[in-house]
Amino acid sequence: MSEPKASPAREVWITGIGLATSLGEGLDANWEALNARRINVDEKTFAPCIVHPWMPVNFDTQIAKKGDQRQMEAWQRIGTYAAGLALDSAGVKGNKEILGGMDMVIAAAGGERDLAVDIAILNAAAKGNSDPGFLNERLMNGLRPTLFLAQLSNLLAGNIAIVHGVSGTSRTFMGEEAASVDAARIALARIAAGQSDIALIGSAYNGERLDLLMLYEFGGFNLKDGFVPVWARQNNPGFALGSAGAFLVIESKAHAQARGAKPYARLTNVVADLAQRTQPGAVTRSLEALWNKLGVHDGNGALITGATGAEPVTSEEKAFLRQHANFAVRATGTMFGQTLEAQFPLGLALAALSISHGALFPPNDPTGLEVEMSKPPTQIVVVGAGHWQGEGMALVEAIE
């Protein structure tokens, strides 16, 4: 008896993009800023640390109810807002039939904190004023009830469902940069296999938080004492946190065509790895192995990376990039900062946007690693190497 033949994988298109970043709101604002080589950094508020602050928006345009806005913390508002932009871009905003079957596969961090309560508890403990019931009393009476909602990672998806009506299946991944790689990988695999027709993928990050800066300072990851582009940080390694929301709508070619949707690009493949970074060169080897699995072909290619500027991962990624010098490189960390879970979907968004414009945005790098690309890119590889663990790669291609 012959084995049944497996169905061919379905083609998957990117049909919607939502961006709200330190460079602005929407695709036009971000594209214009990239082409103007504009960078928005704040070197004073959190000095000596540096952040890429979120560009203020009118939340009412995507989150109509003030009550919904109040029960979210900043990272959830950023994400819910950017998700709405992606749905608008895809032409499905308010379409209950499509939204009712739209799946969500997103990445999220662990929520935000009330710094005033944290500081009061720590100060009391330092002065010896914390009796056995003090901590519970402060947590019960000092925290507003809605803060507990902001602590739940899966409530980013919950808020998107409530505000925008996206009510298919929902999956939330945690794990910094690697989480968003897996979110994209699994969403793509499900659509390609016929288990899903359309999905919303992405993440959001609020980098303007003292508690996060403190945590990354413990690891020696923060860029301090002046901004320089990612590739020029050898003598002062580290990353500048950035605030951003990046979401995409991806769907099968057949589903998109049936509703008359115009694609930005094709999402061809997403692959992931978790290198054991105990030996020098582990990241270089991991990225090369992913490249070989990706299906990159000869032609006009570019490479958009979420390189952080932290070491030793950035130097090891550079070694990989030098092996593929025929691909024009762009580092999102220079323009947008390190946006953790949002870094990989940001790269996907910029890749699709570049392909749809028929041009790669210009380099913003004094070292010469990034070079001009005169021809329209037909394929863009998106690279995500986490600042301390996790590697991922995606292939975004033009649709002929």
PLM feature segments, named:
Residues 186:
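Internal active-site segments that recognize and position negatively charged phosphoryl groups
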Residues 1-169, 173-174, 181, 189-193, ...:
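Conserved "HGTGT" condensation-loop signature of ketosynthase/thiolase-family condensing enzymes
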Residues 198-200:
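Paired acidic/hydrophobic, glycine-rich loop segments that form the ligand-binding mouth/hinge
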